[in-house]
Swiss-Prot record:
May have a role in protein folding or as a chaperone. Pfam families: DJC28_CD (PF09350), DnaJ (PF00226). Residues 48-132 form the J domain. PANTHER family: DNAJ HOMOLOG SUBFAMILY C MEMBER 28, OS08G0560600 PROTEIN. SUPFAM superfamilies: Chaperone J-domain. The gene is Dnajc28. The lineage of its organism: Eukaryota, Metazoa, Chordata, Craniata, Vertebrata. It comes from Mus musculus. This is DnaJ homolog subfamily C member 28. It comes from the Eukaryota. InterPro entries: DnaJ_C_subfamily_28, DnaJ_domain, DnaJ_homolog_subfam-C_membr-28, J_dom_sf. Keywords: Chaperone, Coiled coil.
Length: 385
């Protein structure tokens, strides 16, 4: 008997579990009628609280507080108002607390929804999409085949790209020089640029093929011999060496070399300008000239400060540590210019003394020449007589 009851109970439980598992997850079960009655009663009370505070559902927290302050000044027992009533104030206070908590919960729920929406949007933006075709990350995605084959193709690609860039730079340079003032010719040249380039390429190719057919390339001195691609150092990358050779042949110089030349020319110009300013003031310096010299020195120091900043930039890009430069000292440069000016003044004084001695010697020789000439005339007259 007991076994039969247990078996029936097991079957009933199994049936209920099976039915529960068959319910789709999106379908919500109906709630208990008692819970629905409780929620309806709470909503009615909440509407009554809103009515007591003279507010609409969906108002903000600030509106709730402002309405409570107005009603408190009106119904508080200690306010001294004609409408003061402690029972009404207790109801208003209870309504205020419930409405305020409801408004805060609604505000937090809205913020949570906004944050969830923003997070979903960000996840959608940064969601990884599987590429349709795989791309190589090395060698700029150029080439196909094995890694060694792709490396060779990439070297050829870089060499071709460098050659094209150099040719484009030379063409633009010549175009700026010869067609700088002719807008019409420049526009026409740009419109026919592609056609002219293709025509030149075809012409060069035809000339090469014609020369090969004639046998002009058969008796070359380097035929059948390996090309001299390297400068004798086997540790240099051949691709880098060839690119540098192409750039050097076309007059290109690295940025650090140009900056080094700029620094050298700038310091020479500053020294010459400072020396010329010192020569203009003369020697010795008057009080006015001393003020002028002080202003010149201040300007020189400011220019040296800018030049030292340029040296910092140069030291950051120079590839060789021994090529780096130290800062120039403005005071040492000023002392050096003053020493050069002192040597210049001494040289001028020596030159003036030599010129004075020479002029005095010529003046002393002139009377002797005149006396000798007169004696010779008198002798000639006596001979004639």
């Amino acid at each position: 008997m007991i076994n039969t009851v247990c078996m029936k109970t097991t079957r009933i439980l199994r049936l209920h579990l099976t039915n529960a598992s068959l319910i789709p997850p999106g379908i919500k079960m109906l709630s208990d009628p008692r819970s629905r009655m409780i929620s309806t009663h709470e909503s009615q009370k909440l509407r009554e609280y809103y009515r007591l505070l003279n507010l609409d559902e969906g108002c903000s927290v600030d509106d709730v507080r402002e309405s409570f302050h107005k009603l408190a000044r009106q119904y508080h027992p200690d306010s001294g108002s004609s409408d003061a009533d402690s029972a009404t104030f207790i109801k208003i206070e209870e309504a205020y607390r419930n409405v305020l908590s409801h408004a805060i919960k609604r505000m937090h729920a809205g913020q949570d929804k906004a944050e969830d929406a923003a997070e979903d949007e960000e996840e959608g933006k940064f969601k990884y999409n599987t590429p349709q075709h795989r791309h190589y990350l090395s060698f700029e995605g150029v080439g196909f085949g094995t890694p060694s084959q792709r490396e060779k193709q990439y070297r050829q690609f870089r060499a071709d790209r460098a050659t094209e860039q150099v040719m484009e730079y030379q063409r633009q340079k010549l175009q700026r020089e010869f067609f700088a003032n002719s807008i019409t010719v420049k526009d026409v040249r740009q419109s026919k640029q592609q056609k002219i380039t293709q025509a030149i390429e075809r012409l060069v190719e035809d000339l090469i093929q014609e020369s090969m057919a004639k046998g002009d390339f058969d008796n070359l001195s380097g035929k059948g011999k390996p090309l001299k691609k390297f400068s004798g150092c086997s540790y240099i990358d051949p691709m880098t060496h060839n690119l540098n050779r192409i750039l050097i042949d076309n007059g290109y110089q690295p940025e650090w070399i140009l900056m080094q030349k700029e620094i050298k020319d700038t310091i020479e110009q500053l020294r010459e300008a400072l020396l010329m300013s010192r020569k203009k003031l003369g020697n010795p310096l008057s009080p006015t000239e001393q003020k002028q010299w002080a202003q010149v020195c201040e300007q020189f120091q400011e220019k040296i400060r800018k030049l030292n900043k340029r040296i910092n930039d140069f030291n950051l890009i120079v590839p060789i540590l021994t090529r780096q430069k130290v800062h120039f000292d403005a005071q040492k440069e000023i002392i050096r210019v003053q020493e050069m000016y002192g040597a210049f003044v001494e040289a001028n004084e020596v030159t003036e003394e030599n010129q004075t001695d020479v002029s005095q010697g010529e003046e002393s020789k002139t009377p002797r020449v005149k006396a000798g000439f007169l004696n010779w005339l008198n002798l000639w007259k006596s001979i004639k007589i």
